[in-house]
């Protein structure tokens, strides 16, 4: 029996078919590999959810303010590193029960909700002396200031433990007699600031919380002393008006350290000086090539009772 022989033409066809098949397999495999690569690109939420515990910090109960409104709680982190005199004043008045029952007398949509006046008309205050302004501070006085880029209003934009801030160029230090380079809190939604009259040193007890972006009108003119870290939706429910027809009252204000341990807020903030935060900003498209699109659209992620909030 003769062994069948294949012609050279048939052999060439077979080899060609094998090559095409091999190429097809390679293309398909490459496509699957590309798909796999796309699948492993983490979303902003995945980046935050996989951040190690070492990159989260718990709020200090002594510098955590709980503001109770009819709509619910607002949790505020006080920042004595940014405005020590104003934080001390707020804590003193809170512990006196001064704010309990007072109403928000001036609430402007897209701007501020102002309260803390016992007269309810914007002319009152406490019996304590007025405060000197703390509109800005030297960047070197900040324990942490992480620059994430620049924007249309400031050469340096960043965060100090979650608080949005702007600053002058560091290069100015060598040209100034006092060797200071200034940083200030940006008046973005959620920032807590102190109201005053025309005189810079007239702040006393009245405060306002930001419900809009007012950087151009308030930055470096008013002292910011805290940041809402949870419950901002309740701030949005404060009745509008100058004054409102039905002013929203402060039910009570408390310092978390004065509350029973099991009633204290459970809020953690992502460290803005860690490795995770810049990755999150880039992946979310909030900072591109060193340009910050809108600092007021960025907030440090939180974990509230273990649940992540972006």
Residue ranges and their predicted role:
Residues 2, 30-310:
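Cyclophilin-like peptidyl-prolyl cis-trans isomerases
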Residues 1-10:
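N-terminal secretory signal peptides that target proteins for export/translocation
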Residues 8, 14-15, 120:
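A periodicity- and composition-biased signal for non-globular, repetitive helical segments
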